[in-house]
């Protein structure tokens, strides 16, 4: 099946009624949106789950997590996960066909509460929002639909211009910290990155950036989101944008 990869394997042992879904079922939101991996296939993933649900397995041994027992329990787990994936993809494609940008879609798609409350659909590893991006990438390519980002200016130049227009780097840093303290983490991150790109070696920027991303990380339920944001925090402790960089 196509899912986490384009050659994902699952198996069924008819005599014992044992299903081995591999990583197509992991007792969590499916790992279909990993920000640091290649293309994943959300609708194909759902198709594979539905195919498995028709086998009437009595024991399921997932790639991660506990075994599941009982024909009806297994069927419900598989079909509800498929419904969850299909619903997200259907919403995304509908909005893409209306000419909406990726940013608009990220903030417009709604995740079904009744499905998110199921014990096997908790966003503890992947974040449902990341699935939106993966679907966009599959059908819409790398351009996010923002016309000014098709041929972007150098970010440091753009950031410096914004800081010049504001009139003070300190004002931006202070506002970013204020937003972080108000749990407006996304806006805080936007502002502090603008501050960073305008003055990458500024110690006050890195101090604020460390705090802002540490706070943002703590709010994440998914380990993917938490770890990436925490990486930014740790990098600023070293005066870097990213830990992979080398200091001059």
Where are the regions a protein language model picked out?
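Metallo-beta-lactamase
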Residues: 2-100
């Amino acid at each position: 099946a196509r899912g986490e990869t384009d050659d994902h394997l699952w198996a069924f042992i008819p005599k014992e009624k044992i299903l081995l879904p591999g990583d197509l079922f992991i007792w969590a939101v499916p790992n279909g949106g990993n920000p640091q991996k290649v293309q994943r296939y959300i609708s194909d993933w759902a198709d594979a789950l539905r195919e498995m649900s028709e086998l009437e397995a009595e024991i399921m041994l997932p790639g991660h997590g506990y075994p599941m027992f009982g024909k009806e329990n297994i069927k419900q787990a598989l079909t509800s996960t498929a419904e969850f994936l299909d619903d997200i993809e259907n919403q995304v494609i509908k909005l893409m066909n209306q000419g909406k940008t990726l940013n608009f879609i990220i903030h417009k798609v709604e995740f079904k509460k009744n499905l998110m409350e199921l014990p096997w659909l908790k966003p503890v590893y992947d974040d449902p929002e990341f699935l939106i991006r993966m679907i966009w990438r599959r059908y819409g390519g790398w351009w996010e639909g923002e016309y000014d980002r098709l041929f972007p200016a150098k970010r440091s130049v753009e950031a410096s211009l914004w800081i010049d227009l504001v009139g003070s780097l300190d004002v931006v840093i202070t506002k970013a910290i204020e937003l972080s303290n108000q749990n407006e983490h996304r806006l805080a991150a936007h502002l502090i990155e603008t501050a960073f790109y305008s003055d990458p070696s500024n110690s006050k920027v890195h101090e604020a950036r460390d705090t802002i991303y540490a706070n943002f990380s703590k709010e994440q339920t998914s380990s993917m989101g938490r770890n990436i944001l925490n990486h930014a925090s740790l990098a600023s402790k070293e005066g870097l944008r990213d830990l992979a960089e080398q200091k001059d």
